[in-house]
Amino acid sequence: MDPRKVSELRAFVKMCRQDPSVLHTEEMRFLREWVESMGGKVPPATHKAKSEENTKEEKRDKTTEENIKTEELSSEESDLEIDNEGVIEPDTDAPQEMGDENAEITEEMMDEANEKKGAAIEALNDGELQKAIDLFTDAIKLNPRLAILYAKRASVFVKLQKPNAAIRDCDRAIEINPDSAQPYKWRGKAHRLLGHWEEAAHDLALACKLDYDEDASAMLREVQPRAQKIAEHRRKYERKREEREIKERIERVKKAREEHERAQREEEARRQSGSQYGSFPGGFPGGMPGNFPGGMPGMGGAMPGMAGMAGMPGLNEILSDPEVLAAMQDPEVMVAFQDVAQNPSNMSKYQSNPKVMNLISKLSAKFGGQS
């Protein structure tokens, strides 16, 4: 026998031992039936089960990995220590009155609003903070499109330690006049009370840029180091996150490539197993000795064992014949063929079996035409 064919057969058998599911493909059905007709037993397919096990294991590994990553991220976020001295709990009062911005304002209303504003400032100077709030609110309802009224009321809310109310007033003032420094100053102070260090630094810096104020500048110097520390920590965290994402992308590409290569190897193995069927080395076990009784005319009475068929020209053509293939997949025919191959004198037992004799006639005609 051609040593190359023996090597291919050995590789095929090894592959079947490692992955019996190869034998359970439709292409290998004839081989399963032949093995079983000879009293052999084909191992059950385990590849799928293994794949499911591997999939479950991969899911467990992925879940564990995600948990570890979550813990790492939480650890990275929590390792930032900021001095929160002076930070208070946020106020939860209902939103204050803002006035009707679409109302038609008369000269008299503006004059009255200015009077209310003056009275509110007096109350503020006297330490009557709630009275000042009420008077500023009256002024706002009379002239709701005057930004300074909201900024003044916001300053009182800051003194009352109601930062959220102050922020609402400052937001409204900035909508009306974004070039005024006062709303940014008081919103910055409100953010400082809430521990919003970056927002506080931004607003206070903008207030000083629009109209320098020593009070705003002093608070900016207080909050800026904390804001910078947070920004640096965020950059560090983002950098680590980006590095992790890049690493994960590389790993995903690597796994996809490995999976693709594995699929290619499996496909190649299936193709090889199919081609080995087309020129199955060793032919039928036991060979088919020459001098077939009853004759296989045209074969010269000499068919020195199917072992020699592997190298015979035209073997692929024979095995591609649908009738020959159908006969070879018939357990009854294969048993008879094996019986005759082991003892040619047993041919007489099958003279009346048309399926067996039909196969022998076809092989006789094929090989006879090549002699």
Swiss-Prot record:
Q: Which InterPro entries match?
A: Hip_N (IPR034649), STI1/HOP_DP (IPR041243), STI1_HS-bd (IPR006636), TPR-like_helical_dom_sf (IPR011990), TPR_rpt (IPR019734)
**One Pfam entry name:** HipN
Q: Where does the record place the modification Phosphoserine?
A: S348
Q: Which CDD domains match?
A: Hip_N
- Biased amino acid composition, Gly residues: 280-296
Where are residues bearing N6-acetyllysine located in the sequence? Answer: K355, K362
The name of this protein is Hsc70-interacting protein
Gene of this entry: St13
